[in-house]
Amino acid sequence: MPRSLKKGPFVDDHLLKKVDVQNEKGTKHVIRTWSRRSTVIPDMLGHTIAVHDGRKHVPVFITEGMVGHKLGEFAPTRTFRGHVKEDRRSRRG
């Protein structure tokens, strides 16, 4: 169920503060965050935010198409290594 429109998008205060400071200064340094639950807002456009995936920080460059989505959507937490190919010699029918 989506968030109520009267509440507005959720962004952690510490992340929003870092984005606002960089917007005031006009700098675009990488912002490291563990806040996967924060929503991407238009103020973040053009910034690179390193989102934690449980092991490392994945750099995510924020574009227009990402607005309204959560930061965690762009940093996958699971790595798929593929299914093991079955050996034909071991199967004797």
From Swiss-Prot:
GO molecular function: rRNA binding; structural constituent of ribosome
Entry keyword Ribosomal protein: yes
UniProt entry keywords in alphabetical sequence: Ribonucleoprotein, Ribosomal protein, RNA-binding, rRNA-binding
Gene3D superfamilies, per database record: 30s Ribosomal Protein S19, Chain A
One GO-annotated biological process of the protein: ribosomal small subunit assembly
A Pfam entry, by short name: Ribosomal_S19
CC annotations in GO: cytoplasm; small ribosomal subunit
Family in the record: Belongs to the universal ribosomal protein uS19 family.
UniProt function note: Protein S19 forms a complex with S13 that binds strongly to the 16S ribosomal RNA.
Protein's name in the database: Small ribosomal subunit protein uS19
Organism of this sequence: Parafrankia sp. (strain EAN1pec)
GN (gene name): rpsS
